[in-house]
Amino acid sequence: MSETLGTKLDWQSIEHPSIPDLEADELHLWWLPLSLSTQQQDEALQLLSDIQRDRYLRRRAGDAQEAYLAGRYYLLHLLAAYTETTPDAVQLSYSSMNKPFLSNKEVSHKEHDLQFNFTDTQHQAQRHGLFAFCRQREVGVDIESYARKNNFTAIAADRFT
């Protein structure tokens, strides 16, 4: 499988102007720096739901807040593009495991059940987000640093469903 994987990957730059079509048998991954311009920060704050705003304010001011805000900004914009709507029309709810899902029916069932997941990490001197999108099947992504001394077996048992 590893021999064919590289031939199936179609990496596109962040500057790519449009979202490619997402077919049922595809997985789209987006790796984005979690930083925003002042104008984007203002827009992102307006897009936050009450739950998201509370989570944003509970983070320490600075990098943690900026990364959270940028993550939600990019997530809402990507979801809007995949569902052919606007970022302010995307409504998220959260599962008991705190995983977000599309909660407004007109968006969540459009285009055959869009599924997504997001994680963030420190990469070199900047925080980055990894966003995953697919159709008709659940998806999950996570990034762990090799430098961290974690019990990955315990993490997997606790987090993987």
Model-derived segments and spans:
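Core catalytic alpha/beta fold that binds nucleotide/phospho-ligands
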Residues: 1-161
